[in-house]
Each structure stands twice: as C-alpha cells, then as structure tokens.
C-alpha cells in the first residue's frame, strides 16, 4: 500500500459520516472505503435507528455504496469506531487490505481478529 496516503483526510470523511448519522438522530459511527491510491469508493454511516435495521452499520453502508469491486485486497476501510464482529467478518470475508480505526478504547469489537 502507498505510504503517501493521507489517512487523516480519510478519517475526516468517516467523521463527516458520523456527524450525519448523529444529525439524523442515529448512532454516530461513520466509515468509508477507499482504493489503494486513496480514491473514495463509498462512504456511509450507521443507520440502525433511522432504517430500523440492525444490519446497517457504518462499514456495511460504505461497503454497499462502494458497489461491487473487482478485488478488495487493495482497498482501505476507514471507520470512526472499531468494527464489531459483524463488520469485522465482512472485512475478513472480502479480504479488505487495510483497516484504519479512529477509536478503539471504548469499544474493541472484532479488532483483535483483524
């Protein structure tokens, strides 16, 4: 992976999504999926409350909005909070190459599995 990538800028996209979720009355967790060069593929936020759907987490929302990719090994998932086991499973299943986590002290989720 390219070490010239601005991970802070990527995290800023995820933070914008978290703020959107909070403004909608939902859980403020955001995520974004980028290609290996830092190009945004998809962004999303937790919509469990808004859609009354327990499966719409920030990571799954960003993943879905990115659309089908040829391969995921060269992608980067950026999330404001450590992925839960469900989202960690998605990351492992599709072999997403790198995960950038904004915060993992209050919730560790499946981070040790990644």
Predicted regions and their residues:
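Short, basic/aromatic recognition patches
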Residues: 2-24
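Residue-level signal for beta-strand positions within conserved beta-sheet cores that form or flank
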Residues: 4, 27, 73
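Alpha-helical structural signal
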Residues: 7, 11, 29-30, 59, ...
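A short, flexible N-terminal coil/short beta segment enriched in small residues
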Residues: 14, 21, 37-44
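Generic helix-packing signal
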Residues: 18, 22-25, 35, 48, ...
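Glycine-centered short loops/turns at secondary-structure junctions
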Residues: 25-26, 95
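Short beta-strand scaffold segments in enzyme catalytic cores
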Residues: 29-38
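Zn2+-dependent cytidine deaminase-like catalytic core
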Residues: 42-114
């Amino acid at each position: 992976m390219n070490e010239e990538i601005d991970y802070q800028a990527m995290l800023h996209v995820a933070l914008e999504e978290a703020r959107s979720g909070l403004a909608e009355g939902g859980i403020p967790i955001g995520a974004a999926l980028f290609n290996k060069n830092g190009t945004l593929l998809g962004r999303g936020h937790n919509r469990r409350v808004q859609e009354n759907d327990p499966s719409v987490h920030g990571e799954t929302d960003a993943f879905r909005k990115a659309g089908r990719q040829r391969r995921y090994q060269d992608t980067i998932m950026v999330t404001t909070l450590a992925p839960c086991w469900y989202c960690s499973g998605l990351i492992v299943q599709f072999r997403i190459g790198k995960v950038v986590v904004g915060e993992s002290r209050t919730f560790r989720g499946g981070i040790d599995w990644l």
